[in-house]
Amino acid sequence: MKKIFTILFCVASISASAQNNYSGRYERPLSDVLKSIEKQFHVKIKCDIDTAGKKLPYADFRIRPYSIEETLDNVCKYFDANWWDQGKNTYKLKVYEYARRHTSDGEKMLCWLSAKYNNKEEWEERCNLLRKELRERLEIDAYLDSCLKNAKPQLSKVRKFDGYNVQNICLETLPGEYLYASIYSPAKKGKHALIICPNGHFYEGRYRKDQQQRLATLARMGAICVSYDLYGWGESKREHPNHRTDRAHVIQAMDGLLLLDWMVKNRAKEIDMERIAANGGSGGGSLTVLLSALDERFTAVAPVVSLASHFDGGCPCESGKPIHLSAGGTCNPELLAMMAPKPVLVVSDGGDWTASVPQLEFPYLQRIWGFYGSESNVRNVHLPNERHDFGKNKRQAVYNFFIDVFHLDASKLDEEKVTIEPASSLQTIPMTKE
């Protein structure tokens, strides 16, 4: 028996040795390679990829003793994976994400884009190309052409609160498909600004407290705000349980444009066409940027905790259609720059992918606005000690922006006056068939 064990041990040793030579492609198990890297660079490596049974050829030759980042690059590329620095000498390996890149990649992208235009004329030529290809890749016009033209909406009773009113709307868009929204209006009659407010992937969607606070407060100050469900969220989930689709990408953009059309047509006496905006956070910020690039009626926009040159949006509803391949390649900051020289606010923080905005994306935007001599029209409020949310300071930045550019009534700014309604009150489903 001892002799058998000895033979098996020798065979295993020979086999391992055979792997660690030229004919064996210097192959090593991935799990062992990662342990070696941890030890050599004094780091911790977390894995979201399955390492079981995976082997890395020329493993030791992929290690760059002077750079943990280049080493991880060389390892990850073989397995179609990527790495992310999580701070405190910790790195995470994840499967490749087409919409997410490193900050350094974003910097290279903006440099490449900036070289394409050095004045207003070159920039506007680029805009025309972007606008055309963006619509084609999103397929938005095919969807809009298929929409019902004279569908009669279902409207709830108007609910009256302190300085503002709320009414729900259900609008059939495509045959058998519905858009669900709530309209927050100033109690005072007159011409008002209109703000389309797509929401992101925050818990409870458009029914959450901070969304109601923001829209109601803006309404109290003099803006009509329209909040609508993401495709496959809220009421829409009853019809479309699968939110993470590329179809959601175009439907959500279509819904925003249809709401703008409906409001302008049916409440024309209340809408000041010189004051049309979009404002949303996270995925709602991505949608805000997209809406502004699709429709020139927007006169101001404010994407919150969303904008980055190295992240297109982590959900297919933000990046499922290949819009970022438009015009040879683009990114959300360039799409947002199509608003120039109109007023734009970018709200960013230090706790998510927007941490790079003050040093990277904002200078790029300032350069574009500079082509028009309007650098002051693009603004960045950066909150380095905050995280990914739509908290009070972020809402305050939005209030200040619209008070300035839309001349809202600052004396009405008081979130304590807002009544937080249950989700059921903001839904139209009771009026639709089960």
Name each region found by the language model.
Residues 190-266, 307-317:
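Cap/lid segment of the alpha/beta-hydrolase catalytic domain
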Residues 58, 65-68, 84-178, 190, ...:
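Alpha/beta-hydrolase-fold serine-hydrolase catalytic core, especially in secreted/extracellular enzymes
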Residues 3-13:
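Sec-dependent N-terminal signal peptides
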